[in-house]
Amino acid sequence: RYCPSGCRKKPYGGGCSC
């Protein structure tokens, strides 16, 4: 999956960090 603009994807697959 992709994260919203301005957010980063967590390396552990925990979702997105905004």
From Swiss-Prot:
Compartment annotation: Secreted
Record-level Gene Ontology MF annotations: toxin activity
Keywords assigned: Amidation, Disulfide bond, Secreted, Toxin
Entry GO terms, CC: extracellular region
Expression sites (tissue/organ): Expressed by the venom gland.
Residue list for modification Cysteine amide: 18
Disulphide-bridged cysteine pairs: 3-16, 7-18
Principal subcellular localisation of the protein: secreted
Family per similarity comment: Belongs to the poneritoxin-Ae1 family.
Identification of the protein by name: U1-poneritoxin-Ae1b
Organism of origin: Anochetus emarginatus (Ant)
